[in-house]
Amino acid sequence: MPGLNSVLDIGKRALFAAQSSIEVTGNNISNVNTPGYSRRSVRLEEGMSIDYAPGQMGTGVEAKEVLRHFDTFIEEQYNTKSSNRERWDTLLSNLKNLEMVFNESGEGRLNEAMSKFWKAWQTLAQSPETESTRSALLGDAETMLNAIHFADQSMNTLQRQMGDYIKQDVQRVNEIIHEIAEVNKQIDAHEIEGRNNANQLRDERSTLVRELAKKIDINYIDNGGGDITITTGAGQTLVDGTETFDIKYEGAQAFNSTIPSSDFDGSINFEGKSDYEYTFEVFEAGDVENDTASAPYPPKMKISIDGGETWLRDENGDLEFVYARDSKVTVPNSDLQIWFEDYSSGNEALEVGDKFTVVPKDGLYWYKTSSSKENITPLIKANGESHERRVSEGSLAGYFECRDHYVGRYREKMDSLSKGLVWEVNRIHSQGAGLSKFSSVTGSYSVKSDIKPLGSDSSGLDFRDKFQSA
């Protein structure tokens, strides 16, 4: 029955509600500069009513819960842009270091060394019998080689630095996803929907998600409470509630991906390093064998360096091929050699559509289970876009892109320049004569087998592709 006590109770509840609001407001003010803090407010609700004549009588106000003001849509947009920004910031800072390798403002740089080298040849051509001009050419040649070696070593150092940064990022990503899973567990333990919101834990989780987005592109799905799902931008799950899935930075390796009807039970092996990732797809079926000189020929495979989006072609626009053999075969325009072995049941037949992936470099892998993994190493397609099933944003993507797509390509061009220079200089020089006649000549290169054609992959010659039919 309404009376003085009811009035006092209404006043008491109003004071408690106001006190709660003041405390929350004070907490907001004190944390105005706290990173990751979200503004909070008290949700007030009318107290229960009592049936009484002439009508229901109210019992005042109640502070029901403390709400966290957080816009999920804006947060998702922020994390997406943060991933993109970190990728380009990482690229920018490291490409500046690459730019310094080719800075021509100092002494002994590559351009200056090459200019002196060619001038020394011109001087020698005018007076080839002079010992001093010959010595000057040798000195300038050594200077140029030192400049080339310095540039290559500097780029190699940059790539090793990228590898160290990648290791650090991978370690931190795994730490973050485990921390998020632990916070999810705590949220489930403390939160009671509509009564007790774990706002501090939610802020902590959001801060971790923001940090994760800087490392790797992510998608975030909030199913309520501690039940959230975080995947990579390509869809690989990193966090599912309290369950986690790690990523790992591992060494060079190869994978089989045969079609369902294929009985091939061997494996592809490789030797050598490359900044490319190679995909080989069987174009003409057959049995893996050693001899390519007569029919039936071994399987013929086409080659891709962008995950099978496009296929390598020669200068005439025709597809480049490599044979699938059980002896080493050199992949065109590379230092990579591949071969097939380990046939557990003797099935050496390859079918059209069988695929093999060779990653002759350190790469990034997502583990669904301890024995099931997926290659998520960032990969740039021929059109310049990132591969949709790989990591494409965040600092991890920036480091990989700098290491493989930029520094790696420059090293490839430098290597091609060096090989072309060596071949042309030696070819022209071999047509001349020294000041004294030779009594004997020993070649710098040797063949692996004296029964293999000199221009074949099996010859072992570094310049086998230079041989021409008479």
Show where each model-derived region lies.
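Structural signature of extracellular appendage/secretion-system components
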Residues: 1-470
